[in-house]
Regions:
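N-terminal subdomain of nucleotide-sugar transferases
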Residues: 1-57, 62
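A structural signal for isolated positions on well-ordered beta-strands in alpha/beta enzyme cores
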Residues: 4, 36-37, 127, 166-168
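Acceptor-binding helix/loop patch of EC 2.4 sugar-transfer enzymes
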Residues: 8, 66-73, 97, 122-155
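A short, charged, and often flexible helix/loop element on the N-terminal side
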Residues: 57-87, 145-149
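An aromatic- and histidine-rich active-site surface loop
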Residues: 82-84, 99-124, 128-131, 136
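Glycine-rich phosphate-binding loop signature in dinucleotide/nucleotide-binding domains
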Residues: 92-99
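Membrane-proximal helix-turn-helix segments that form the acceptor-binding/catalytic region
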Residues: 113, 117-121, 148-167
Length: 174
């Protein structure tokens, strides 16, 4: 199967997300599948770059900065992250219709429009690896109150876009 993996980080980044996605991509490759990884990258100067690591194709798409900046600016940049990634993705040589499924890694809920676009264009199913349940963590941090926006985000952005939920830990039951 041709699988598209979308994440916020991938090696050489040294985050737990990067390591987990690399391990997942390598395991898929070992099992005979063909994984391709897409990540946003604020460091690149072109719309996109393509590389191969251990037999895995990696597309780095130009994006706004989303780390090591103030909270307000990060929120704005993450809101527009999917738009930047869709524009860059459309410039690549990647054939979205060649994939059998897309797997994406949270907590970046702002991948929702990107996943919706890919699913609509290619008619494939998506699977979310859920690290923490959004918008629950925004309640925990006091960034959001339970109200219409909370319920909209919880129902539409997450549960209507993904097909399967995999939890890393059970602190926030569904």
């Amino acid at each position: 199967m041709n699988l598209l993996l979308i994440s916020i980080h991938y090696p050489p980044f040294k985050s737990s997300c990067a390591v987990q996605m690399r391990d997942l991509a390598e395991q898929f490759l070992l099992e005979g599948h063909s994984p391709t990884v897409i990540i946003p990258d604020e460091r690149i100067k072109t719309k996109w770059t393509k590389e191969t690591q251990n037999g895995i194709k990696i597309y780095r798409l130009s994006s706004p900065r989303i780390s090591d900046i103030n909270f307000f600016r990060r929120a704005i940049n993450e809101i527009f992250l999917s738009i930047f990634m869709i524009k860059a993705l459309n410039k690549t040589d990647l054939d979205i219709n060649s994939f059998n499924g897309v797997i994406w890694y949270s907590p970046t809920i702002f991948f929702g429009p990107l996943i919706w676009y890919i699913k609509r264009k290619s008619k494939i199913k998506s699977y979310l690896i859920l690290r923490d349940i959004f918008p629950e963590w925004t309640l925990d941090l006091g960034l959001m109150k339970k109200g219409p926006i909370y319920f909209f985000l919880k129902q539409w952005l997450i549960f209507n876009i993904m097909l399967l939920i995999q939890l890393e830990y059970n602190q926030n039951p569904i």
